[in-house]
Structure formats: C-alpha cells, structure tokens
Amino acid sequence: ADPRFRETDVGEWQGLTHDQIERDWPGYLEAHNRPPGFESDISIVTRVTAALVDLAEQFPGGEVLVVAHAGVIRVMRRAHRVGDSRIPNLGGCEFIVRPDATEVITVGDVVELFEHGEIGEEL
C-alpha cells in the first residue's frame, strides 16, 4: 500500500470523536476551522498526484484500482474544479492520469458501487 493515498492528517484532532472535538474545540466544526497540524489541501493534492503519476508510469496504458478515503477523493475533485459532492460509502471516482499531457489528471464522475439499500446489514 502506498502511504500517499492515506486519509487527511487532521492534526490535533487525530483519534478524537466528533463529540470530543465539539467539547474541546467549541465552534470549530461549525465554522469550518481547522486545528494546528491539519493537513492542507495543497499537501494532499501534491502527494496524491505524485502517487497517481507514479502508478501511471509503472502501468502505462493500463488500469489500476486505488482505494482511498472519501476525504482524499473530495480534495482531488475540488482541486480539479469538478465539485465537492459527497462520496458514498463504497463509492468512488475515476481519475484518468496522463503523465505527459498538459492536463495530467482528468476527473470523472462520482460512482456508487451499490445502490442505496442494496447491501444488507451483514456488512
């Protein structure tokens, strides 16, 4: 697994529950503020783009499945100006990577692997 596809580093919030953040950082979530050490979108885009380009060069003309957290996918979609839509659980997004092109990454639509309610509670 390539660590460059990891979830956003949330700094001092790492390991805390939503309730703990609300208690210890009142108003931060509602105001969309971030604590010290919270990874910037630029940092995420830089590391994920480098990882995608490396894969494209390793498998030229091939298709590769990358599993990443929805937060990382949303940051990449925002960076490429295709929206900030929610990524459903077990959903994803296609990224077409052409290392030698002017536009290295082209972003596709959000996809759902399963229709809502199609998966039973056994998962």
Where are these regions (language model features)?
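Phosphate-coordination/substrate-recognition cap region in phosphate-metabolizing enzymes
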Residues: 1-23, 29
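Residue-level signal for well-ordered alpha-helical positions
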Residues: 13, 24, 58, 79-80
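Short glycine/proline- and acidic residue-enriched helix-loop micro-motifs
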Residues: 24-43, 123
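Glycine-rich phosphate-binding loop signature in dinucleotide/nucleotide-binding domains
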Residues: 55-62
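Generic beta-sheet signal
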Residues: 62-70
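Short, active-site-adjacent cap segments at secondary-structure transitions
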Residues: 72-74
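Domain-level recognition of soluble alpha/beta enzyme cores
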Residues: 81-107
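Acidic, His/Gly-rich catalytic cores of divalent-metal-dependent hydrolytic chemistry
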Residues: 108-123
